């Protein structure tokens, strides 16, 4: 069987792509990503797990805004040398483009934090680069992933989603009329984490026909994707079997870095606890026991803000701490988890720590055979930015059934 020819834009470390590869139905012709650390990991994953002998060439580290060079090739001080995307696609007919621009400019939380509401952020218009690639290669379909906040983002005088809908329609693609229906709650697909994303499917009206495109898009959201819902998973389903990491009571060194907790036994890749201060360990124990013993003294925002001030001497407008509950999906795994992890405290008081890279990856549904390489900062960031592969696989299966099965 000939595989579905796909390219992945804004690929990150490949969460979206990994789910598609797991089905065995798709071939990744190219993946485009501008950050070095995700590219490094993506190349390793494509070669070691998915057995692409030419992974080095298929992963293009480049700035997608330089679209013409992306197509034709470049020789660049920062990004090195490549023959470009058109060379990789060659004579293949492209079936599918997947990916989504960075979501920070559309994120409601990001807009609240930024004094200008992210109106001046260049990332508001990265969808235009995605669109240029779609227009150039005319795939039968595309999947555009982003945060639900994109529906309300308005950097100029019009909502960004109106511009996106209009420009993709002008390019000859059919999208769902009411994109609120395109918001998907990933907990409904077995992802053990409270994470919702907008998944925009676009179909080439010239290829499928005007009326059939509309029917297929509606069928995708109303029938095909919902038919693949899975039982809900809790955080403990994902991380409960990992080796326990206990406070040592003193600092030690491991690989030249300071550690405050025991190493995993048996060893598990990427499962090393961050160094925690004695003060933080004490706070974590207090918060974890508060839940374990059903006291719930520190559930309210005010109580948590008061505790933070009492323990650190500083004031905060937002509460800093959150303990992951064993019997619920975890809170969102964000890209900024690399900063401190205080909102992702492990549920067990005996461990008194924030979650590890491997636990974040498990909550994002990456398989343990995806071994991440880089600093904690790089790894937490790329994992937090990813689409959970468990959902990606379901998405890939749904698209295959709807669009590609009879090809």
Describe the residue ranges of each PLM region.
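Short alpha-helical patches at coil-to-helix transitions and adjacent helical residues
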Residues: 13, 161, 197, 385-389, ...
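Core alpha/beta nucleotide-donor-binding catalytic domains of modification enzymes
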Residues: 2-138, 148-159
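A generic secondary-structure signal for well-formed alpha-helical elements
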Residues: 24, 46, 101, 151, ...
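Short, flexible loop/turn elements at secondary-structure junctions
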Residues: 10, 36, 64, 101-102, ...
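Class I S-adenosyl-L-methionine
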Residues: 75-79, 84-91, 106-309
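Short, acidic Gly/Pro/Ser/Thr-rich loop/turn segments
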Residues: 104, 207-209, 338-343
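C-terminal target-recognition/interaction regions appended to catalytic cores
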Residues: 257-407
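Short, well-ordered beta-strand micro-motif
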Residues: 98, 199-203, 334
